[in-house]
Amino acid sequence: MKALAKLKPEEGIWMVDAPKPEMGHNDLLIKIRKTAICGTDVHIYNWDEWSQKTIPVPMVVGHEYVGEVVGIGQEVRGFKIGDRVSGEGHITCGHCRNCRAGRTHLCRNTTGVGVNREGSFAEYLVIPAFNAFKIPDDISDDLAAIFDPFGNAVHTALSFDLVGEDVLITGAGPIGIMAAAVCRHVGARHVVITDVNEYRLELARKMGATRAVNVAKENLKDVMKDLGMTEGFDVGLEMSGVPAAFHAMLDTMNHGGKIAMLGIPGGEMAIDWSKVIFKGLIIKGIYGREMFETWYKMASLLQSGLDLSPIVTHHFKVDDFQQGFDAMRSGQSGKVILSWD
């Protein structure tokens, strides 16, 4: 089968002819329709320090996808041939304390599709049936293909009550932008998102952000004053992993504010803990998606009118995958979709 793989420990992704994956008793075989390129895939392409420590070579990569069930393991119930599915990319052990308590997103033995095991940049993918999620008919293939990062946005945004609250989002990557759209959809008052990438900030404006702030040109506290905010942000969503962005968030949070952190700093990050302590801030780390409450929320948000379509900015045939990676690496894109049909 046709696939995209990390073949060598150097920059790049390569088209290969890979063996069709074999299905176990509890697995589904999925024929891939569309995949999306994740920031993680760009890290793997660039072969940065994280990738060198994490990614086995050679391996088929990719983990954002939608496809059709074409094979069902003999122990599987609840799926049929032809079902349209996406899937949770974190494969969990089922045996640790968190898994047995239903907190599978906190499994300490997680393996990642396209990170630790064969991924979805291929004509066929095998995953445990437990990880598959049926896509409602009224949700497009494009949006189904980005359920994985959309889930990161939903999990982060819905960590705290947002109704009538003022929200600061640091980092206008696709996940941060989708989080802004979610916050507005569920009833936040002001949703302010910060970055230095004008292309992405304009996307955030299209997706409903109250203000999209280029912090290289504008002062965040001036923006707050323009909006009539006198006390600070109630909720912070840190999506960038940039220390300066987190410092700005701590400076502008209201007392008793709540912060959800999805962005991963490049190394250890020193902060002024007195701001956390004296403001009485709550900080919550976010990893992946809650299985499968986040997935149900994603489908429900889209079915209730949340419009994510502007976040998908580029489409390519899989044979033109290099153009897709070039678009993602340029920073001048939202989500990039590769078609496998």
From Swiss-Prot:
Question: Which GO molecular function terms does the record list?
Answer: L-threonine 3-dehydrogenase activity; zinc ion binding
Needed cofactors = Zn(2+)
The UniProt keyword set, sorted, is: Cytoplasm, Metal-binding, NAD, Oxidoreductase, Zinc
The free-text function statement in the UniProt record for this protein reads: Catalyzes the NAD(+)-dependent oxidation of L-threonine to 2-amino-3-ketobutyrate.
BP term (GO), one: L-threonine catabolic process to glycine
State where the protein is found.
Cytoplasm
GO CC terms of this entry: cytoplasm
Q: Where does Zn(2+) 2 bind?
A: C93, C96, C99, C107
* Major subcellular location class: cytoplasm
Name the Gene3D superfamilies on file. Answer: Medium-chain alcohol dehydrogenases, catalytic domain (3.90.180.10), NAD(P)-binding Rossmann-like Domain (3.40.50.720)
Q: How does it assemble?
A: Homotetramer.
Binding positions (NAD(+))? I175, D195, R200, L262, G263, I264, I286, Y287
Q: In which pathway does it act?
A: Amino-acid degradation; L-threonine degradation via oxydo-reductase pathway; glycine from L-threonine: step 1/2
Q: What EC numbers are recorded for this enzyme?
A: 1.1.1.103
Report the cofactor remark. Binds 2 Zn(2+) ions per subunit.
The highest taxon in the source lineage is Bacteria
**Which reactions is this enzyme annotated as catalysing?**
L-threonine + NAD(+) = (2S)-2-amino-3-oxobutanoate + NADH + H(+)
Name-wise, this protein is L-threonine 3-dehydrogenase
Q: Which InterPro entries does this one have? A: ADH-like_C, ADH-like_N, ADH_Zn_CS, GroES-like_sf, L-Threonine_3-DHase, NAD(P)-bd_dom_sf, PKS_ER, Zn_alcohol_dh
Give the positions the UniProt entry annotates as the active site. T40, H43
Q: Which residues bind Zn(2+) 1?
A: C38, H63, E64
Write down the position(s) of the site called Important for catalytic activity for the proton relay mechanism but does not participate directly in the coordination of zinc atom: D148
| Stated family | Belongs to the zinc-containing alcohol dehydrogenase family.
Organism listed in the record: Shewanella amazonensis (strain ATCC BAA-1098 / SB2B)
